[in-house]
């Protein structure tokens, strides 16, 4: 699973997810991308499930770029524990995703196969997504 090697503070505040993505909203590496349309936490397990789904669809052709990383820990108390007694133990790692963020990119394959792979990966995520294509105007990527 994806997780940071080390962090300064293990336990974080939950935070708020308001507004759109600040960066990472353009397809920079591949030709096709999967763009988030809603705010949500994406877990390391969901990212891994998408990675497996895409690589199985692409087989040995093309290249995959994962543009999100789970760098935020979330905590949970054990079942049937009483309230209080401090913050729970770290349960897992999530990536905070806002609308407009590119989650995955694919390059080196035709459009039909790229769409098939990204549509299959989108079923593994808890958010609405959209498949976007790299925009090129006058030979330059925008």
Swiss-Prot record:
Subunit relationships: Part of the 50S ribosomal subunit.
Signal peptide region: none
Pfam families assigned: Ribosomal_L16
Keyword tRNA-binding: yes
Any one GO biological process: translation
InterPro entries: Ribosomal_uL16, Ribosomal_uL16_bact-type, Ribosomal_uL16_CS, Ribosomal_uL16_dom, Ribosomal_uL16_sf
Protein name: Large ribosomal subunit protein uL16
Stored SUPFAM superfamilies: Ribosomal protein L16p/L10e
PROSITE patterns xrefs: RIBOSOMAL_L16_1
UniProt family annotation: Belongs to the universal ribosomal protein uL16 family.
PANTHER family named among the record's database cross-references: 50S/60S RIBOSOMAL PROTEIN L16, LARGE RIBOSOMAL SUBUNIT PROTEIN UL16M
Function noted in UniProt: Binds 23S rRNA and is also seen to make contacts with the A and possibly P site tRNAs.
GO cellular component term, pick one: cytosolic large ribosomal subunit
Gene Ontology terms for molecular function: rRNA binding; structural constituent of ribosome; tRNA binding
Keywords: Ribonucleoprotein, Ribosomal protein, RNA-binding, rRNA-binding, tRNA-binding
